[in-house]
UniProtKB/Swiss-Prot annotation:
GO terms for biological process: mitochondrial translation. Belongs to the mitochondrion-specific ribosomal protein mL65 family. Component of the mitochondrial ribosome small subunit (28S) which comprises a 12S rRNA and about 30 distinct proteins. This is Large ribosomal subunit protein mL65. Its main location: mitochondrion. InterPro entries: Ribosomal_mL37/mL65, Ribosomal_mL65. It is found in: Mitochondrion. Disulfide bonds: none annotated.
Length: 442
């Protein structure tokens, strides 16, 4: 039986015949692996996805180029302009909303954990100064009685207008009076900026959705949110309030997870100018928040909710207002310092809030620990924003015969303690103040 035959292809060099090439190949020395010379690096540019293609790689490259543009922005104003210039439909978040359990939805939107009770005072905080409680109580009672007379003279057209005008004027006068009286005890208040009904806006991205219809059907798009808040009064200072807990403080409480879209709250989408605003321009030296004062509208007051068999929603209204308003305020402060979702904060941002319906007051403290709320930035981000809050308590019961009945000193003291909170002094300033106190001692 004949043996099987096969053909072997022999490479032929240029200018050689086939027989000559075969002889040259047979006589050539063997080349081992260690003698192979490394091939030079390719000099052509890397192959990347097209900027205009309809693919995941192309979309990722466009996002990376946009992020690089934000990182390279020369100023904070330019960075905010780039982050807010593209207008898409976004969910408009109202801090004062009548939806049931809105506070749980707002915790999910802002990655905030709510902690019942107020945080303890910082360990290195100085002892509280001695207060003349009787003088403070008399000043607040005078404000209440004075505004009662003025509102009665104006004679609003309806009972609703009268109650809103009375609560608004009382809150305005009480805040101004207490700030002036406490300025000698807290020098920060003497140089602070006191705003009245100033806008506070914040725009951010949180979560994703699949577009159900249209020419972009099936695409994955980010969920966008916008808060347009208007606190009744707010105090801005030039230095930052001290943190309540460390930046990476771990809390075991979980954030509520909402499996429905925000439309079910309900929240509605609108397309208009994106805005990030703390109440002042970026060049303002008073760029940090101290305390906000919010007035609950008449449609959300506890008497109306109790009549509608929604007594459990009374405190939820206060919590939702605090979470949304303080997140927007502290988030805007952080972005004024150059932080955003892809450049997360390196220090906490702290602010306080007092929320009232004219008679009942509730107190909240907020610490912003992260702005990385997008799906990509939040993948390995253990930080959570924290909100502490108290139950609402009355400042007074009623006004009868030009006398304030049932005045609660505890509520007044809590307002005073909020206003006396001040930035932490550095080591040199703290040592100088202690030496001054020793020199002025008995």
């Amino acid at each position: 039986m004949a043996a099987a035959r096969y053909w072997k292809l022999v490479p032929r060099g240029r200018g050689l015949s086939q027989n000559a090439a075969a002889k040259a190949s047979a006589t050539a020395p063997e080349v081992r692996d260690l003698e192979v010379v490394a091939t030079p690096v390719a000099r052509y540019p890397p192959i990347v996805a097209s900027m205009t293609a309809d693919s995941k790689a192309a979309r990722q490259r466009r996002v990376q180029r946009w992020q690089a543009t934000v990182h390279a922005a020369p100023s904070v104003d330019e960075k905010i302009r780039i982050l807010t210039k593209m207008q898409f439909k976004k969910y408009v978040v109202h801090p004062q909303i009548s939806a049931l359990n809105a506070d749980r939805w707002y915790q999910s939107f802002t990655k905030t954990v709510f902690v019942s009770g107020l945080p303890p005072a910082p360990a290195l905080s100085p002892p509280p100064p001695s207060l003349d409680l009787a003088a403070l109580r008399a000043a607040v009672c005078d404000c209440i009685l004075q505004e009662q007379v003025y509102v009665r003279r104006r004679r609003p057209r309806s009972l609703f207008d009268r109650r809103q005008a009375l609560a608004s004027s009382i809150l305005d006068q009480v805040v101004r009076t207490l700030v002036n009286l406490l300025a000698p005890l807290n020098p920060v208040l003497s140089t602070a900026a006191l705003d009245c009904k100033r806008s506070v806006d914040f725009y951010w991205l949180r979560g994703e959705e699949r577009i159900p219809a249209g020419h972009r059907k099936g695409h994955i798009d980010a969920l966008r949110y916008q808060i347009n808040d208007k606190p009744h009064n707010q105090i801005r200072i030039s230095k930052q309030l001290p943190e309540f807990v460390p930046l990476d403080y771990s809390i075991p409480t979980e954030i509520p997870v909402m499996k429905c879209k925000p439309d079910k709250l309900p929240l509605f989408r609108r397309q208009y100018e994106n805005s990030i605003f703390t109440g002042s321009k970026t060049a303002d030296p008073c760029c940090y928040g101290h305390t906000q004062f919010h007035l609950i509208p008449d449609r959300l007051k506890r008497e109306r909710l109790i009549r509608q068999n929604q007594a459990e929603q009374v405190e939820a209204v206060f919590r939702a207002n605090a979470i949304a308003s303080l997140f927007a305020w502290t988030g805007a402060q952080a972005m004024y310092q150059g932080f955003w979702s892809e450049a997360d904060v390196t220090r906490p941002f702290v602010s306080q809030a007092v929320i009232t319906d004219g008679k009942y007051f509730s107190f909240f403290c907020y610490q912003l620990n992260t702005l990385a709320l997008t799906v990509q930035a939040d993948q390995n981000n253990p930080r959570k924003n924290l909100c502490w809050g108290s139950q609402s308590q009355p400042l007074y019961e009623t006004v009868e015969d030009n006398d304030v009945k049932g005045f609660d000193d505890g509520t007044l003291l809590q307002i005073v303690h909020f206003l006396l909170n001040k930035p932490r002094e550095d080591g040199a300033q703290l040592l100088a103040s202690q030496e001054k106190e020793l020199d002025l001692g008995p």
